[in-house]
Amino acid sequence: MGEIPVRGSGEGEADMQAGDPATGVVIATLVLYKLVLIAIGVWASRLNRNESDFFLGGRGLGAWVAGLSYAASTSSAWVLLGFSGFVYVYGVSALWMVPGIWAGYVGVWLWFGPRLRAETAERNYVTVTDFMAASAGPSTRALIAILAGGLVLFTFVFYIAAQFGAAAVAFESQFALPHTESVLLGAVVILIYGLLGGFWAVSLTDTLQGAMMALIAVLLPAAGLVAAGGPVQMWATLSETMPSAYLDITGERGFVPFLAFAFGVAAIGLGTFGQPHLMARLMAVKDEKARRTGFTIAMSWAVLVYFGMALLALSGRALLGEIFDPEALFYEMANLLLPAVLAGVVIAAILSAVMSTVDSLLIAASAAAAHDLKLIRLFPRREVMISRVVMASICVFAVALTLSVDATIFDRVLFSWSALGAAFGPVIAARVMNAAPKGWAVLAAIVLGFATTVLFYTYGQIGAEAAGGGLSGMLARLAAIPGDPFERVVPWILPLVLVFSFRQPRPVEDRRS
């Protein structure tokens, strides 16, 4: 089938010009949504009295807020746009990613959750770095905080900038807004409610976003399935129009290539265990009952949304055939299947989801700078004010990067999910499993996990031919294996071996079951 233009190009752009009813609905929906976000920020501002309130919501998150805000922070627009596009391209074999992602939910909430919540509350830890460095001596603990805070700040500033860029592209394509205005519009609204309300505002707005995403993940895939003629007809269409590998669970790969691909895409879930903004949700949940209920809510959301997006991808392939940009599938299907006004509402929700990805990252990056790098110690009893100044500074810097640095640079740093996961995840896992790694081992594990991810990512970008022979050629060939198992798994294994090999006895009173 031929390519169907999206709104913002060709005839689609004409539909969204000023005066078109859908355009008015999109703008009205966005304005209303942003006003709600700002109102939440104003309301939540009265809850911020100290550093713990601003970065952890006073450790008072209930089950629904914790569960839905975690889910939205984990996936946000990525699952609607990126995951659906991935399944659209690779077919049924792409679904091997899903068990790994779901396993990440289970591991964080049921394995990490009990100890992480209890110990961080008891000892008043503000960031996950405090938890990682607990077994180190004072001087080494300070080095761990500086290293971890610096890595979070570096990767998240670039990731935030990438999200601002993605939001800008969406605004440009939908409303023909200039690039600078598009970036500033998203940044200003996020900064306002984040500055006012801190973690509470971010969690509440992410809860709203998570609920909206779940609703969309039901409505649009259902419309797609009906338009494709139902599940039987959809499968028959794909069988006739696509290569047989598209509907094969292995992608018709050989046994070893299939294992590498499935293992690699499933290992995306490993990155979950080292994300500071996700660990913060577990640290902030108010009690064990809320944690258990929050897991049920988050897991139900994940099953619903990932199933819906997989269905959307397959029905979209049956309906549309080949399209220019797979990550535009969601927009394509909304424009094709829904009335103009309703499609406008859906697109407005996606634009909001793209921008709302940033808020949790901003809080985590601000915590890294203000708490881990000890900036708040320069101004005693001004913790909230300093945290807000840091957040504003990070946002301004990210906006400047968005406007001045080539977008391809942003693409190269989107590996931060795997890099931070490999840097922090093994150390957190060791602490959760009652190990007390020596301080220097924690430092070395963080460096090793991050550096190994960078190594394989870099060689994957270079390619085997450009790398030549010898060790470089071998690393490039390993990095080029479909599914990227060496980029996602090896950087986890090496630090894990390190922290378990160099442990110190824990005092009896510090041991937990």
Model-predicted regions and their roles:
Residues 12-513:
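Membrane-embedded helix-loop-helix hairpins and adjacent transmembrane boundary segments
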Residues 3-15:
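Short, Lys/Arg-enriched N-terminal segments with co-localized hydrophobic residues
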